A protein has these predicted regions:
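Beta->alpha turn/N-cap motifs
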Residues: 58-63, 96-101, 110, 114-122, ...
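Periplasmic-binding protein-like
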Residues: 137-144, 207, 211-253, 272-277
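Flexible hinge/capping segments at coil-to-helix
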Residues: 144-162
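Bacterial lipoprotein signal-peptidase II cleavage site
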Residues: 25-38
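Extracytoplasmic small-molecule ligand-binding "clamshell" domains
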Residues: 36-118
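Extended ligand-binding regions for polar small-molecule ligands
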Residues: 29-31, 79-88, 169, 233-272
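Alpha-to-beta junction loops
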Residues: 55-56, 90-92, 109-117, 161, ...
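Short helix-initiation/N-cap motifs at beta->coil->alpha
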Residues: 95-106, 150, 167-170, 183-197, ...
Length: 277
């Protein structure tokens, strides 16, 4: 009789523990989905980001816009502005290094909240994302070994070169436009390495990156850039329909008025490219 009572108590204890575990798991799942549910009910990406407490920023290694310092922290003009904007809406910025060719998938899957990485406002980007107003001017430039630069001073002269370009980038678009052969790599930094190693004749990269990373006093002292293939502008991309784009436009305007945006640009020597708001 006593053994039966003990057995019943053991069974009851197991059931209670199991029920408690299920309840706790359900609670955790509820916490992680609260931000999503509120965003769905309000239709606000801004509220979604505020509720979860983080703005997840998709980036690549792209000096002077986004790159890691000696401590492994993301810095650069875009990175610093992202941190400041996140603070202004009461959250923290987190940085995730992405495959540039998959940036739209990362956004739509909510593994990131924005693409803030010197992104050129081409038609494809503007049709698939909610983009801010342009905040910086740029161009795609041709990078070649410095001792060969004199040979490549116009588009016609570079058409027969083999290029390295970042997959899905504006540089890739421009190389396709002129009809040159190219190899797509994972980042603009990798494109520079391809030229430095002799695997490619040239690279098409952002002018701002070229100014920061090649030439005398850099790790690519033997490289230089010659011609511009286009003129373009940078913007930040959010999920289609996101109200964060308008919030960031407002922040850009205020930070231009109070001088903080220009001060940040001066830190990374890109102030001449800023678009006045």
């Amino acid at each position: 009789m006593m053994e039966g009572v003990i057995m019943k108590r053991k069974v009851l204890s197991v059931l209670l523990c199991a029920g408690l575990a299920v309840f706790m798991l359900a609670g955790c799942g509820s916490d992680s989905s609260n931000a999503n549910k509120k965003a769905e009910s309000t239709g606000s990406d801004l509220e979604y980001v505020k509720d979860k407490g983080t703005l997840v920023v998709g980036v690549t290694d792209f000096e002077p816009m986004d790159y890691k310092d000696d401590n492994g922290e993301w810095v650069g003009f875009d990175a610093d502005m992202a941190k400041a904007f996140a603070e202004s809406i009461g959250v923290k910025a987190e940085f995730v290094e992405i495959d540039w060719d998959n940036k739209e998938l990362e956004l739509d899957g909510k593994s990131i909240d924005c693409v803030w990485n010197g992104m050129t406002l081409i038609d494809e980007v503007k049709s698939s994302m909610e983009c801010t107003d342009a905040y910086m001017n740029n161009a795609q430039v041709v990078v070649v070994p410095a001792d060969k630069a004199d040979k490549y001073q116009d588009e016609e002269s570079v058409k027969d070169l083999t290029f390295a370009v970042e997959a899905g980038s504006a540089g890739e678009d421009q190389v396709e436009r002129i009809g040159a052969q190219y190899t797509a790599v994972s980042s603009q930094a990798d494109a520079l390495m391809e030229v430095a190693s002799g695997n490619s004749d040239a690279a098409a990269i952002d002018a701002l990156m070229a100014a920061a990373m090649i030439g005398e006093g850099t790790g690519y002292a033997d490289l230089t850039y010659t011609i511009s293939l286009n003129n373009e502008e940078y913007g930040v991309g959010f999920r289609k329909g996101s109200d964060l784009a308008a919030a960031l436009n407002d922040y850009f305007k205020k930070s231009m008025e109070d001088g903080s945006m220009k001060k940040c640009a001066e830190t990374y020597k890109v102030q001449a490219a800023l678009i006045e708001k």
